[in-house]
């Protein structure tokens, strides 16, 4: 049990995360795109989130004769979380429901990317509701870690 706890803590604290200046958090995945999206979709449903749609951008590109590395978008949310956030700043609704982009870069590395909740708060001038933003940060980070870890 102690070993498991230490392992989980190491994954949590040392997970490869990249913060971009544009408000996107990207986490390296240990899996291919499809597996990462499948894992994310499963954890979202297990935790009571609504998965609205899963979009395979590479398939869309192929339909018009274009090539695109594996890239999928999953759109999900829960009004229990989204509504209070919109009550703090209704314009944040343009960025809701939440989205996660799972994509493969030119080197073959798979990433799971999502909007940084702090960035959304700043973008929509949400100065209150700090606890809601913290909760969303924690939940999204947990979902991403579960989907991407070995």
Model-derived regions, located:
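Beta-strand/loop substructures that line and gate deep hydrophobic ligand-binding cavities in soluble
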Residues: 99-126
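Stable alpha-helical elements in mature extracytoplasmic
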Residues: 36, 40, 57, 132, ...
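C-terminal partner/receptor-binding element of secreted or periplasmic proteins
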Residues: 118-150
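Compact, glycine-rich, soluble single-domain proteins
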Residues: 45, 56-98, 102
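Terminal, regulation- and interaction-focused segments at domain boundaries
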Residues: 19-50, 145
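Soluble periplasmic/extracytoplasmic beta-strand elements of cell-envelope proteins
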Residues: 26-28, 73-75, 101, 111-113
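Bacterial N-terminal signal peptides
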Residues: 6-15
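Positively charged n-region of N-terminal signal peptides that target proteins for export
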Residues: 1-4
